[in-house]
Protein backbone atom coordinates (compact mmCIF):
# COMPACT_ATOMS: atom_id res chain seq x y z
CA UNK A 1 0.00 0.00 0.00
CA UNK A 2 1.27 3.47 -0.88
CA UNK A 3 2.45 5.69 1.93
CA UNK A 4 -0.05 8.35 2.97
CA UNK A 5 -3.01 6.53 1.36
CA UNK A 6 -5.93 8.66 2.45
CA UNK A 7 -9.06 7.51 4.22
CA UNK A 8 -11.84 9.90 5.22
CA UNK A 9 -14.85 9.53 7.48
CA UNK A 10 -17.53 12.07 8.31
CA UNK A 11 -20.63 12.45 10.44
CA UNK A 12 -23.31 15.05 11.13
CA UNK A 13 -25.14 15.31 14.43
CA UNK A 14 -28.18 17.32 15.48
CA UNK A 15 -27.44 19.70 18.36
CA UNK A 16 -30.78 21.49 18.33
CA UNK A 17 -31.89 22.20 21.91
CA UNK A 18 -34.53 19.77 23.06
CA UNK A 19 -38.00 21.32 23.58
CA UNK A 20 -37.68 20.94 27.35
CA UNK A 21 -34.54 23.12 27.35
CA UNK A 22 -36.21 26.30 26.10
CA UNK A 23 -36.26 29.25 26.64
CA UNK A 24 -32.71 30.53 26.20
CA UNK A 25 -31.47 34.04 26.77
CA UNK A 26 -30.44 35.87 23.61
CA UNK A 27 -27.66 38.42 23.07
CA UNK A 28 -27.40 41.38 25.48
CA UNK A 29 -28.22 43.64 22.55
CA UNK A 30 -31.68 42.12 22.36
CA UNK A 31 -32.81 43.12 25.81
CA UNK A 32 -35.64 40.82 26.84
CA UNK A 33 -35.36 38.63 23.74
CA UNK A 34 -35.39 34.88 24.32
CA UNK A 35 -35.34 31.85 22.07
CA UNK A 36 -38.53 29.91 22.69
CA UNK A 37 -38.22 27.34 19.88
CA UNK A 38 -36.01 26.16 17.00
CA UNK A 39 -37.07 26.90 13.44
CA UNK A 40 -34.44 24.65 11.83
CA UNK A 41 -32.07 21.97 13.05
CA UNK A 42 -28.69 23.06 14.39
CA UNK A 43 -25.78 20.76 13.49
CA UNK A 44 -22.20 19.91 14.23
CA UNK A 45 -20.06 18.01 11.75
CA UNK A 46 -16.97 15.88 12.17
CA UNK A 47 -14.51 15.07 9.37
CA UNK A 48 -11.57 12.75 10.06
CA UNK A 49 -8.60 12.31 7.73
CA UNK A 50 -6.40 9.21 8.12
CA UNK A 51 -3.37 8.71 5.87
CA UNK A 52 -1.98 5.68 7.66
CA UNK A 53 0.58 7.81 9.49
CA UNK A 54 -1.58 10.45 11.16
CA UNK A 55 -5.22 11.14 11.84
CA UNK A 56 -6.63 14.67 11.73
CA UNK A 57 -9.98 15.70 13.20
CA UNK A 58 -12.05 18.66 12.04
CA UNK A 59 -15.03 19.35 14.30
CA UNK A 60 -17.20 22.24 13.09
CA UNK A 61 -20.26 23.32 15.04
CA UNK A 62 -23.03 25.82 14.45
CA UNK A 63 -23.02 26.50 18.19
CA UNK A 64 -20.22 26.58 20.75
CA UNK A 65 -20.19 23.11 22.23
CA UNK A 66 -19.49 21.59 25.61
CA UNK A 67 -16.01 21.44 27.04
CA UNK A 68 -13.52 21.08 24.20
CA UNK A 69 -10.74 20.02 26.53
CA UNK A 70 -12.61 16.82 27.36
CA UNK A 71 -13.64 16.22 23.75
CA UNK A 72 -9.99 16.52 22.74
CA UNK A 73 -8.96 14.13 25.52
CA UNK A 74 -11.53 11.59 24.31
CA UNK A 75 -10.31 11.73 20.70
CA UNK A 76 -6.70 11.37 21.82
CA UNK A 77 -7.23 8.47 24.19
CA UNK A 78 -9.71 6.44 22.15
CA UNK A 79 -8.49 7.04 18.60
CA UNK A 80 -4.86 8.02 18.96
CA UNK A 81 -5.33 11.45 17.42
CA UNK A 82 -2.50 13.65 18.66
CA UNK A 83 -3.33 16.95 20.30
CA UNK A 84 -1.99 19.13 17.50
CA UNK A 85 -3.96 17.19 14.87
CA UNK A 86 -7.33 18.33 16.23
CA UNK A 87 -9.16 21.45 15.03
CA UNK A 88 -12.36 22.72 16.64
CA UNK A 89 -14.18 25.69 15.14
CA UNK A 90 -17.65 27.18 15.09
CA UNK A 91 -19.52 28.96 12.33
CA UNK A 92 -20.09 32.00 14.54
CA UNK A 93 -23.84 31.81 14.18
CA UNK A 94 -25.53 34.58 16.13
CA UNK A 95 -28.81 32.63 16.27
CA UNK A 96 -27.86 29.82 18.64
CA UNK A 97 -28.05 29.78 22.45
CA UNK A 98 -25.26 31.88 23.94
CA UNK A 99 -24.20 29.31 26.51
CA UNK A 100 -23.68 25.60 26.02
CA UNK A 101 -21.69 25.13 29.20
CA UNK A 102 -20.81 21.68 30.48
CA UNK A 103 -17.79 20.28 32.26
CA UNK A 104 -17.82 16.55 33.07
CA UNK A 105 -15.08 17.21 35.59
CA UNK A 106 -17.29 19.28 37.87
CA UNK A 107 -20.91 20.10 38.71
CA UNK A 108 -23.14 23.03 37.88
CA UNK A 109 -23.06 24.14 41.50
CA UNK A 110 -19.26 24.03 41.63
CA UNK A 111 -18.96 25.92 38.35
CA UNK A 112 -21.18 28.72 39.62
CA UNK A 113 -19.16 29.22 42.80
CA UNK A 114 -16.59 31.13 40.80
CA UNK A 115 -17.81 34.41 39.34
CA UNK A 116 -16.44 34.78 35.82
CA UNK A 117 -15.77 38.17 34.31
CA UNK A 118 -17.10 38.87 30.84
CA UNK A 119 -16.41 41.73 28.48
CA UNK A 120 -18.86 44.05 30.25
CA UNK A 121 -18.58 42.82 33.83
CA UNK A 122 -19.51 39.72 35.85
CA UNK A 123 -21.20 36.99 33.84
CA UNK A 124 -24.55 35.65 34.97
CA UNK A 125 -24.52 32.19 36.59
CA UNK A 126 -24.91 29.21 34.28
CA UNK A 127 -28.54 28.11 34.26
CA UNK A 128 -29.69 24.49 34.43
CA UNK A 129 -30.96 24.49 30.85
CA UNK A 130 -27.63 25.91 29.63
CA UNK A 131 -25.80 23.14 31.47
CA UNK A 132 -28.17 20.50 30.06
CA UNK A 133 -27.69 21.86 26.55
CA UNK A 134 -23.93 21.89 27.01
CA UNK A 135 -24.02 18.26 28.10
CA UNK A 136 -26.14 17.37 25.06
CA UNK A 137 -23.69 19.13 22.71
CA UNK A 138 -20.77 17.39 24.43
CA UNK A 139 -22.40 13.97 23.99
CA UNK A 140 -23.26 14.67 20.36
CA UNK A 141 -19.67 15.78 19.70
CA UNK A 142 -18.40 12.46 21.04
CA UNK A 143 -20.97 10.59 18.94
CA UNK A 144 -19.94 12.51 15.82
CA UNK A 145 -16.29 11.57 16.33
CA UNK A 146 -17.24 7.91 16.89
CA UNK A 147 -19.33 7.81 13.73
CA UNK A 148 -16.72 9.61 11.63
CA UNK A 149 -14.09 7.05 12.64
CA UNK A 150 -16.51 4.19 11.94
CA UNK A 151 -17.19 5.68 8.50
CA UNK A 152 -13.54 5.86 7.41
CA UNK A 153 -13.07 4.66 3.83
CA UNK A 154 -10.49 5.06 1.04
CA UNK A 155 -10.71 8.57 -0.35
CA UNK A 156 -9.25 11.11 -2.73
CA UNK A 157 -8.82 14.80 -2.03
CA UNK A 158 -9.07 17.93 -4.14
CA UNK A 159 -9.63 21.63 -3.60
CA UNK A 160 -10.59 24.71 -5.58
CA UNK A 161 -11.57 28.35 -5.32
CA UNK A 162 -14.46 30.27 -6.81
CA UNK A 163 -16.39 33.44 -6.10
CA UNK A 164 -19.55 34.23 -4.16
CA UNK A 165 -21.15 37.63 -3.77
CA UNK A 166 -23.21 37.51 -0.59
CA UNK A 167 -20.89 39.57 1.65
CA UNK A 168 -20.00 43.24 2.01
CA UNK A 169 -17.86 45.34 4.35
CA UNK A 170 -19.80 46.43 7.41
CA UNK A 171 -17.58 49.46 8.11
CA UNK A 172 -20.11 52.09 7.05
CA UNK A 173 -18.99 55.72 6.86
CA UNK A 174 -21.72 58.05 8.10
CA UNK A 175 -22.24 61.62 6.83
CA UNK A 176 -20.69 62.94 10.06
CA UNK A 177 -17.44 61.09 9.33
CA UNK A 178 -17.96 58.42 11.97
CA UNK A 179 -17.81 54.71 11.18
CA UNK A 180 -20.66 52.47 12.32
CA UNK A 181 -21.88 48.95 11.70
CA UNK A 182 -23.65 48.95 8.37
CA UNK A 183 -22.64 48.33 4.76
CA UNK A 184 -19.86 49.89 2.71
CA UNK A 185 -19.27 48.71 -0.88
CA UNK A 186 -16.08 50.79 -1.10
CA UNK A 187 -14.20 48.99 1.68
CA UNK A 188 -12.36 45.67 1.06
CA UNK A 189 -14.41 42.50 0.80
CA UNK A 190 -13.06 39.05 -0.05
CA UNK A 191 -15.40 37.16 -2.40
CA UNK A 192 -13.24 34.01 -2.45
CA UNK A 193 -15.19 30.80 -1.91
CA UNK A 194 -12.80 27.96 -1.03
CA UNK A 195 -13.83 24.31 -0.92
CA UNK A 196 -12.18 21.07 0.12
CA UNK A 197 -13.60 17.91 -1.44
CA UNK A 198 -13.17 14.31 -0.29
CA UNK A 199 -14.60 11.54 -2.50
CA UNK A 200 -14.70 7.76 -2.26
CA UNK A 201 -13.35 5.27 -4.80
CA UNK A 202 -16.55 5.61 -6.84
CA UNK A 203 -16.31 9.39 -6.99
CA UNK A 204 -19.14 10.05 -4.54
CA UNK A 205 -18.47 12.84 -2.08
CA UNK A 206 -17.77 11.70 1.47
CA UNK A 207 -17.32 15.17 2.88
CA UNK A 208 -16.80 18.77 1.88
CA UNK A 209 -15.59 21.87 3.67
CA UNK A 210 -16.69 25.35 2.56
CA UNK A 211 -14.82 28.49 3.61
CA UNK A 212 -16.09 32.05 3.16
CA UNK A 213 -15.86 35.44 4.89
CA UNK A 214 -19.28 36.46 6.18
CA UNK A 215 -21.12 36.71 9.48
CA UNK A 216 -24.15 34.54 10.19
CA UNK A 217 -26.21 37.38 11.62
CA UNK A 218 -29.45 37.18 9.68
CA UNK A 219 -31.75 35.79 12.35
CA UNK A 220 -30.51 36.87 15.75
CA UNK A 221 -32.82 39.91 16.07
CA UNK A 222 -35.90 38.38 14.46
CA UNK A 223 -39.28 37.88 16.06
CA UNK A 224 -41.99 35.92 14.28
CA UNK A 225 -45.57 37.08 13.86
CA UNK A 226 -46.36 35.85 17.38
CA UNK A 227 -43.48 37.76 18.93
CA UNK A 228 -41.25 34.74 19.50
CA UNK A 229 -37.56 34.34 18.67
CA UNK A 230 -36.23 31.15 17.10
CA UNK A 231 -32.86 29.44 17.31
CA UNK A 232 -31.24 27.99 14.19
CA UNK A 233 -27.93 27.68 12.38
CA UNK A 234 -28.44 31.01 10.59
CA UNK A 235 -26.83 31.67 7.21
CA UNK A 236 -23.94 29.22 7.64
CA UNK A 237 -26.26 26.38 8.61
CA UNK A 238 -28.60 27.07 5.72
CA UNK A 239 -25.72 27.01 3.22
CA UNK A 240 -24.41 23.68 4.53
CA UNK A 241 -27.91 22.20 4.52
CA UNK A 242 -28.52 23.40 0.95
CA UNK A 243 -25.37 21.73 -0.39
CA UNK A 244 -25.99 18.50 1.52
CA UNK A 245 -29.55 18.36 0.19
CA UNK A 246 -28.33 18.99 -3.36
CA UNK A 247 -25.95 16.04 -3.11
CA UNK A 248 -28.70 13.88 -1.60
CA UNK A 249 -30.81 14.58 -4.68
CA UNK A 250 -27.86 13.34 -6.75
CA UNK A 251 -27.86 10.15 -4.68
CA UNK A 252 -24.79 11.07 -2.62
CA UNK A 253 -25.06 11.18 1.16
CA UNK A 254 -22.38 13.62 2.23
CA UNK A 255 -21.39 15.85 5.12
CA UNK A 256 -20.62 19.49 4.32
CA UNK A 257 -19.10 21.77 6.96
CA UNK A 258 -19.21 25.54 6.45
CA UNK A 259 -16.38 27.53 8.05
CA UNK A 260 -15.95 31.28 8.45
CA UNK A 261 -12.89 32.89 6.87
CA UNK A 262 -11.51 36.35 7.73
CA UNK A 263 -14.95 37.86 8.08
CA UNK A 264 -14.89 39.91 11.29
CA UNK A 265 -16.01 43.00 9.39
CA UNK A 266 -17.99 41.24 6.65
CA UNK A 267 -21.78 41.22 6.86
CA UNK A 268 -24.39 39.59 4.61
CA UNK A 269 -25.12 41.86 1.69
CA UNK A 270 -28.83 41.95 2.63
CA UNK A 271 -28.47 43.22 6.19
CA UNK A 272 -28.40 46.47 8.16
CA UNK A 273 -31.40 48.56 7.17
CA UNK A 274 -30.67 51.86 8.88
CA UNK A 275 -33.16 54.73 8.80
CA UNK A 276 -31.69 57.98 7.46
CA UNK A 277 -33.39 61.38 7.79
CA UNK A 278 -32.99 64.51 5.63
CA UNK A 279 -31.68 66.49 8.60
CA UNK A 280 -28.66 64.17 8.80
CA UNK A 281 -29.87 62.17 11.78
CA UNK A 282 -30.26 58.42 11.62
CA UNK A 283 -31.53 55.39 13.51
CA UNK A 284 -29.28 52.33 13.57
CA UNK A 285 -30.93 49.12 12.54
CA UNK A 286 -29.05 47.15 15.19
CA UNK A 287 -29.89 48.60 18.59
CA UNK A 288 -31.16 47.58 22.00
CA UNK A 289 -34.52 45.84 22.09
CA UNK A 290 -35.14 46.53 18.39
CA UNK A 291 -36.40 43.54 16.47
CA UNK A 292 -36.94 42.66 12.82
CA UNK A 293 -39.52 40.51 11.10
CA UNK A 294 -39.49 37.10 9.47
CA UNK A 295 -38.44 38.63 6.17
CA UNK A 296 -34.86 38.30 7.46
CA UNK A 297 -35.26 34.52 7.44
CA UNK A 298 -36.38 34.70 3.81
CA UNK A 299 -33.38 36.84 2.89
CA UNK A 300 -31.10 34.38 4.67
CA UNK A 301 -32.56 31.46 2.73
CA UNK A 302 -32.15 33.43 -0.50
CA UNK A 303 -28.46 34.14 0.13
CA UNK A 304 -27.86 30.57 1.32
CA UNK A 305 -29.26 29.23 -1.94
CA UNK A 306 -27.07 31.63 -3.91
CA UNK A 307 -23.91 30.55 -2.13
CA UNK A 308 -25.04 26.94 -2.13
CA UNK A 309 -25.20 27.01 -5.91
CA UNK A 310 -21.86 28.82 -6.05
CA UNK A 311 -20.33 26.08 -3.89
CA UNK A 312 -21.79 23.31 -6.03
CA UNK A 313 -20.15 24.83 -9.10
CA UNK A 314 -16.78 24.97 -7.36
CA UNK A 315 -17.09 21.40 -6.04
CA UNK A 316 -18.02 20.19 -9.54
CA UNK A 317 -15.04 22.00 -11.08
CA UNK A 318 -12.56 19.82 -9.18
CA UNK A 319 -11.13 17.22 -11.53
CA UNK A 320 -7.71 16.57 -10.01
CA UNK A 321 -8.01 14.51 -6.86
CA UNK A 322 -5.17 12.69 -5.13
CA UNK A 323 -5.26 9.58 -2.97
CA UNK A 324 -1.84 9.87 -1.31
CA UNK A 325 -2.01 12.86 1.00
CA UNK A 326 0.60 13.95 3.49
CA UNK A 327 -0.67 15.98 6.46
CA UNK A 328 1.61 18.36 8.36
CA UNK A 329 0.76 20.61 11.28
CA UNK A 330 2.37 23.47 13.20
CA UNK A 331 0.93 25.34 16.18
CA UNK A 332 1.62 28.59 17.97
CA UNK A 333 0.11 30.44 20.93
CA UNK A 334 0.58 34.20 20.92
CA UNK A 335 0.71 36.22 24.12
CA UNK A 336 0.04 39.87 23.31
CA UNK A 337 -0.14 42.95 25.55
CA UNK A 338 -3.66 44.07 26.36
CA UNK A 339 -5.37 47.41 25.93
CA UNK A 340 -8.70 48.91 26.87
CA UNK A 341 -10.74 51.53 25.05
CA UNK A 342 -12.12 54.27 27.28
CA UNK A 343 -15.73 55.46 26.98
CA UNK A 344 -16.79 52.21 25.40
CA UNK A 345 -19.31 49.86 26.99
CA UNK A 346 -22.87 48.61 26.89
CA UNK A 347 -24.45 51.98 25.99
CA UNK A 348 -22.27 52.17 22.88
CA UNK A 349 -22.97 48.52 22.07
CA UNK A 350 -26.70 49.11 22.41
CA UNK A 351 -26.78 52.18 20.14
CA UNK A 352 -24.05 53.39 17.76
CA UNK A 353 -25.30 56.95 18.23
CA UNK A 354 -23.84 56.87 21.75
CA UNK A 355 -20.31 56.52 20.37
CA UNK A 356 -18.23 59.68 20.70
CA UNK A 357 -14.93 59.24 18.88
CA UNK A 358 -13.47 62.31 20.55
CA UNK A 359 -13.67 60.59 23.94
CA UNK A 360 -12.42 57.16 22.90
CA UNK A 361 -8.77 56.33 23.33
CA UNK A 362 -6.61 53.41 24.40
CA UNK A 363 -5.07 52.82 27.80
CA UNK A 364 -2.63 50.06 28.69
CA UNK A 365 -3.77 47.24 30.95
CA UNK A 366 -0.66 46.27 32.94
CA UNK A 367 0.04 42.59 33.54
CA UNK A 368 -2.86 41.46 31.36
CA UNK A 369 -2.45 39.64 28.09
CA UNK A 370 -4.49 38.43 25.16
CA UNK A 371 -3.87 34.87 24.00
CA UNK A 372 -4.45 33.79 20.40
CA UNK A 373 -4.12 30.19 19.30
CA UNK A 374 -2.92 29.48 15.75
CA UNK A 375 -2.70 26.27 13.75
CA UNK A 376 -1.29 25.73 10.25
CA UNK A 377 -2.37 22.54 8.50
CA UNK A 378 -0.90 21.43 5.17
CA UNK A 379 -3.17 18.88 3.49
CA UNK A 380 -1.28 17.74 0.43
CA UNK A 381 -0.41 21.04 -1.24
CA UNK A 382 -3.19 23.05 0.45
CA UNK A 383 -2.41 25.28 3.45
CA UNK A 384 -5.19 25.82 6.02
CA UNK A 385 -4.56 28.50 8.66
CA UNK A 386 -6.71 28.35 11.80
CA UNK A 387 -7.06 31.50 13.89
CA UNK A 388 -8.64 31.91 17.30
CA UNK A 389 -11.04 34.83 17.29
CA UNK A 390 -12.35 37.06 14.52
CA UNK A 391 -10.02 38.38 11.83
CA UNK A 392 -10.58 41.51 9.76
CA UNK A 393 -10.85 40.84 6.05
CA UNK A 394 -7.99 43.25 5.28
CA UNK A 395 -5.65 41.18 7.46
CA UNK A 396 -6.85 37.95 5.87
CA UNK A 397 -6.32 39.20 2.33
CA UNK A 398 -2.79 40.33 3.17
CA UNK A 399 -1.98 36.98 4.79
CA UNK A 400 -3.17 35.18 1.66
CA UNK A 401 -1.02 37.39 -0.52
CA UNK A 402 2.05 36.85 1.66
CA UNK A 403 1.71 33.10 2.25
CA UNK A 404 4.50 30.95 0.73
CA UNK A 405 1.90 28.54 -0.68
CA UNK A 406 -1.03 29.47 -2.90
CA UNK A 407 -4.72 29.20 -2.04
CA UNK A 408 -4.36 29.76 1.70
CA UNK A 409 -7.62 28.88 3.46
CA UNK A 410 -8.17 30.89 6.65
CA UNK A 411 -10.50 29.35 9.23
CA UNK A 412 -11.39 31.77 12.01
CA UNK A 413 -13.40 31.19 15.19
CA UNK A 414 -10.97 28.34 15.76
CA UNK A 415 -11.12 27.11 19.35
CA UNK A 416 -7.93 25.61 20.77
CA UNK A 417 -8.86 22.99 23.35
CA UNK A 418 -6.24 24.01 25.89
CA UNK A 419 -6.43 23.14 29.57
CA UNK A 420 -8.53 25.58 31.57
CA UNK A 421 -5.67 26.52 33.87
CA UNK A 422 -3.46 27.77 31.03
CA UNK A 423 -5.48 30.94 30.71
CA UNK A 424 -9.01 32.23 30.50
CA UNK A 425 -9.50 32.51 26.76
CA UNK A 426 -13.27 32.95 26.56
CA UNK A 427 -13.66 36.28 28.30
CA UNK A 428 -15.37 38.29 25.60
CA UNK A 429 -16.11 38.68 21.93
CA UNK A 430 -13.10 40.41 20.46
CA UNK A 431 -12.27 41.93 17.10
CA UNK A 432 -8.59 42.17 16.25
CA UNK A 433 -8.42 45.30 14.12
CA UNK A 434 -5.64 46.24 11.73
CA UNK A 435 -3.72 49.52 11.91
CA UNK A 436 -6.18 51.29 9.62
CA UNK A 437 -9.18 50.25 11.70
CA UNK A 438 -7.31 51.22 14.85
CA UNK A 439 -6.50 54.69 13.58
CA UNK A 440 -9.90 55.36 12.00
CA UNK A 441 -12.01 53.99 14.87
CA UNK A 442 -14.03 51.53 12.82
CA UNK A 443 -16.94 49.84 14.63
CA UNK A 444 -14.63 47.03 15.75
CA UNK A 445 -12.15 49.41 17.36
CA UNK A 446 -14.01 49.57 20.66
CA UNK A 447 -13.69 45.82 21.15
CA UNK A 448 -10.07 45.45 20.06
CA UNK A 449 -8.15 44.06 23.07
CA UNK A 450 -4.56 44.16 21.73
CA UNK A 451 -2.25 47.09 22.39
CA UNK A 452 -1.39 49.29 19.38
CA UNK A 453 -3.17 46.89 16.99
CA UNK A 454 -0.06 44.73 16.69
CA UNK A 455 -2.09 41.55 16.10
CA UNK A 456 -1.50 41.47 12.34
CA UNK A 457 2.24 41.96 12.74
CA UNK A 458 2.58 39.16 15.29
CA UNK A 459 0.23 36.77 13.47
CA UNK A 460 2.12 37.30 10.21
CA UNK A 461 5.44 36.56 11.91
CA UNK A 462 3.99 33.41 13.46
CA UNK A 463 2.49 32.26 10.15
CA UNK A 464 5.85 32.50 8.38
CA UNK A 465 7.49 30.67 11.27
CA UNK A 466 4.91 27.88 11.01
CA UNK A 467 5.34 27.60 7.25
CA UNK A 468 9.09 27.36 7.77
CA UNK A 469 8.60 24.57 10.30
CA UNK A 470 6.45 22.57 7.87
CA UNK A 471 8.30 23.26 4.63
CA UNK A 472 11.83 23.01 6.06
CA UNK A 473 11.56 20.41 8.83
CA UNK A 474 15.25 19.47 8.82
CA UNK A 475 16.66 22.99 9.16
Regions found by a protein language model. Name each.
Residues 1-255, 259-302, 308, 315, ...:
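Conserved beta-alpha junction segments in alpha/beta enzyme cores
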Amino acid sequence: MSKYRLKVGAARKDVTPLPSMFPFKQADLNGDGQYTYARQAIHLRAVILDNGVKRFLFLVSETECGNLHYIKKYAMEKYGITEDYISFSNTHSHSCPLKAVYDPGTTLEEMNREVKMGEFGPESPVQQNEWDYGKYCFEQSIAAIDDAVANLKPARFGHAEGKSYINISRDELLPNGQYAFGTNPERPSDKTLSVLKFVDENGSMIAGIINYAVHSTMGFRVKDKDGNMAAYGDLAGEIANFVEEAYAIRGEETVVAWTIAAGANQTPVHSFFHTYHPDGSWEPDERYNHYLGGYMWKLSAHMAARQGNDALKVFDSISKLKENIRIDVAERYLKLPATKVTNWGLPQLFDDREIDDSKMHNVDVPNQFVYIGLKLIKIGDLPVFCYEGEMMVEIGMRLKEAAPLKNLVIVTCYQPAVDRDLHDRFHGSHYYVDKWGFENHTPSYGRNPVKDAITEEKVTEAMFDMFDEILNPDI
